[in-house]
């Protein structure tokens, strides 16, 4: 009888501990998140980068993420970009975030001399993370971009 009580107690404890386990937030596909942000903006013509070009321009290796969408100004005349990555794990997420921060800083230095009118966009660049998904947005209207991102993130949460 005592053995059965202990087993029941252990099962309840295991169930309670499993229920407290941290879950990752549901996130949309990177391409969907990028499209939502771009739809909120009046941007230059944007082009989506391949994994090879992501590694070349942003120094983010394909082994760090499970999904990505990076859209930049096709002409490179503006600093506008939407970079969305879903990392494989927390360690890789930190590496992606560091690379995005470095990219933004490098762009700021380049555009300071090349196109000083682009500097305010870079200075107000938005970097947000939800679960394993991190986003860098350099856009004409950072508030509208953030609202669009929050809307797709919250909409994704409601459907799960």
What are these regions (language model features)?
Residues 93, 97-129, 159-160:
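Short Gly/Thr-rich strand-loop-strand
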């Amino acid at each position: 009888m005592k053995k059965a009580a202990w087993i029941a107690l252990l099962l309840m404890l295991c169930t309670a501990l499993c229920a407290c386990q941290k879950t990752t937030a549901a996130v949309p596909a990177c391409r969907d998140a990028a499209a939502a942000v771009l739809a909120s903006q009046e941007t230059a013509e944007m082009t989506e980068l391949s994994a090879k070009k992501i590694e070349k321009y942003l120094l983010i290796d394909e082994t760090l993420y499970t999904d990505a969408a990076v859209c930049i100004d096709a002409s490179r005349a503006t600093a506008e970009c939407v970079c969305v990555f879903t990392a494989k794990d927390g360690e890789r997420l930190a590496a992606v975030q560091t690379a995005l921060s470095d990219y933004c800083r490098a762009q700021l230095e380049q555009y300071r001399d090349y196109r000083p009118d682009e500097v305010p966009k870079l200075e107000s660049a938005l970097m947000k993370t939800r679960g394993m998904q991190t986003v860098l947005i350099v856009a004409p209207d950072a508030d509208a971009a953030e609202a669009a991102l929050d809307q797709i993130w919250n909409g994704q949460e409601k459907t799960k």
